[in-house]
């Protein structure tokens, strides 16, 4: 005698809220706007921002998500002005400024501008002191960001700094004071934190004590994402990473000239941001924007090849690229540092519905579909989703899978026992192993009666 079994599936799927495509572009830029009479962007900055938004050295173009500014007058003045400019030159965004002013004894302070469509600013913290035995010229700001559509496991930190300038043992020692304060704070966050150390760090060589402090062992150990450590100042070997000065002739009061000969501006990262998983640096994307190593050392960046620059900015003509190069010599006295970062994976899992009734002893299969739903525009914009699935009770299945961002999703067949009449149930579980995965677990129940 054959009995008919009614089959019911109950499942829980941890999904995600839709958000804008959001692999992240982070830029730090000393803009020399500390003068209260000249706190806003200079003529030509719009061309620089448009060029950065369109540049694709890492393989894709992306509007700036986080902009760290050095030598800002204040968040209320410089911050408001730059957020307004970015909202003008970039569509589909909503740029906001940070809210806390770091202490400063001169030459402004670091601030942050961020695209609230792609990241949230979770916290701001001042690091160090401008007075006392361990004083520094300007406090560092620590910003805690979270990608939109993710939870706290995807948070990352950006330290925004402007270290003591100039050569000499006393200045080097002062830079080390700043580096020690930052490392103490970063180490206290704990092992596994994803950190970017950004800003005008004013190092002339990687042998400086301050650079060694940042890159020393410990929770917050910094690494150069492009592995270009050495004696940068005045060296033709390192002209591709030089950031100051793009100008040889001053066009505004206080502009430092002298041509391109120093790597003062950096994005250094902790090991967790270069291990290939979760929030992570995208290899090949880091550069001093506008520097194609086609200029001469100690000459203006505008002596470089517009043709070579246009090749890194899809859709740009050599004329447009030359406008960018010229603007870089006029808007400030540093080049911006630009790098792209991937987002963590985002898992979705579903169980397909079964027929309401099946024949006892027949072969019944269910399907489990797992996908990487990271909200990106290109596959390189998010980590690969790696996972394992298991089943228990009346359901038989186990295995592993991977899905790239923008992948086609994976379907796994589950076998359900129908040999016994009466209530039969089983569970299906999926656990992601990719770091920081959003919605990393799934559990579904299959019942028969």
Describe these PLM feature segments.
Residues 4-13:
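Sec-dependent N-terminal signal peptides
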Residues 343-449:
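Feature for long, exposed domains in two main contexts
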